[in-house]
Amino acid sequence: MSVKISRSVYADMFGPTTGDRVRLADTDLIIEVEKDFTTYGEEVKFGGGKVIRDGMGQSQVTNKDGAADTVITNALIVDHWGIVKADVAIKAGMISAIGKAGNPDIQPGVDIIIGPGTDVIAGEGKILTAGGFDSHIHFICPQQIEHALMSGVTTMLGGGTGPSHGTFATTCTPGPWHIGRMIQSFDAFPVNLGISGKGNAALPGALIEMVEGGACALKLHEDWGTTPAAIDNCLTVADDHDVQVMIHSDTLNESGFVEDTIKAFKGRTIHAFHTEGAGGGHAPDIIKVAGLENVLPSSTNPTRPFTRNTIDEHLDMLMVCHHLDPSIAEDLAFAESRIRKETIAAEDILHDLGALSMMSSDSQAMGRLGEVIIRTWQTADKMKKQRGSLSQDSARNDNFRVKRYIAKYTINPAIAHGVSKLIGSVETGKMADLVLWSPAFFGVKPDCIVKAGMIVAAPMGDPNASIPTPQPVHYQPMFGAYGRALTASSVVFTSQAAAAGHLARDLGIAKALYPVSNVRGGISKKSMIHNDATPNIEVDPETYEVRADGELLTCAPAEVLPMAQRYFMY
């Protein structure tokens, strides 16, 4: 017997379905469900008097014979490839299926089997995304990692050794000894981690030593001397070992101008950090590289989006992070040369055009690692308010814009750093690094963070209460963040040379090493999903005005942002 119910009642019970629209947090961004993989009348839902019970939605199939370990039911998946409603199966820590869950003995169209050995995470009315990937981390303190995780970031890549002055300023872990000690420390943290070695050297020996010692990338930073010779040598070593190179170029233009740096690239693939330039790079025109085919450009989040406070806060940040003295005129001039409202405004628009491909933090070194996701969506919202709907979107929804922006902190950094076969999207065969959000809190405060199929963090009420919801509610690590479950549910990214050797044995680590691959000639700007635009970018050296294909890129700073004080006390 069938019964008709209204869309609103259906959405309240099973979550939105095809054609329903959902607002993201308190932004103006609206998504519309493109497809529903579940079957009307055969939806599965857990709870008293609900469907997932023995002989009903739960079959007798064992896990060995194909039942899922976990099913996330009726979730609204938001990813670069689509915005769809589906059940998601997790098996052995990997996403094993996206489709319709249930009991195939009595239900039609079941491609995810629920058995006695299957747990359930209720996704009704929730949004499901891939865990975030922050590819610009200064490992200044270990407490960063918990803050990032609680924001929805499950993978972090960067450099450093702790609160040394080299780490305060540069995203580099120098030398195999430091790299080894950092990798040993990674056994304590329930996220995927990777180390970038110092790439500043004119001869290859020391760089090869770091790559073989466990670095999964090399970082060129101006504070260590990003000369054309160092750039060329670093890229040569990277080509030989299939690791990525990230660059923070020469703000002072001492060893050359942006054209000299581009020449040193020799057309080779490189990840350009804080491409706008406030975080560092040839003043005033490093932003030009965002239009090159071989450059994978990213932003750091303190300039995201351009607001009335952006300029003022940057000078103090820069002084602290780069060991500058405000009483020295040259240091002050160095700082002021990097902070330009014209290029920061253009950065907003270049993100909206898909010319800037990735978002990252620059953690504690002119960036806030707990705000990568928030600031991505604040930028998207600001651009919708100021520029209207994208041509690829309809009047009903912002689906393409949302796919463009979510790719900036999920799949694109995974592609850029050679790990997209394992992480970066909600797709079968990938590690189940997933984040559930209530739509009203999307991008701000996750409901649940899953790492390799196990809940690793969530908001949790008073542990002494009779139910899990009473105040005070805090984000807390869960069982997936402890013991051997932690090391079994996350990996360390390394070079192929390190993974093929005896590094894991020599360091005595419990986490698996995962070798990065296909980060050199096999990828380019065209590999950046929804963010592959290559406009010709020009910067006026006197006014700092930015033009893309001849069009002036400018916008007003935001006075008010969504996803801000409505959600936080401070």
From Swiss-Prot:
Keyword NAD listed: no
Names of the cofactor(s): Ni cation
Biological source species: Rhodopseudomonas palustris (strain BisB5)
Gene that encodes it: ureC
Full protein name: Urease subunit alpha
Keyword list, A-Z: Cytoplasm, Hydrolase, Metal-binding, Nickel
Cofactor note: Binds 2 nickel ions per subunit.
Binding residues annotated for substrate, in chain numbering: 221
Stretches assigned to the Urease domain: 131-570
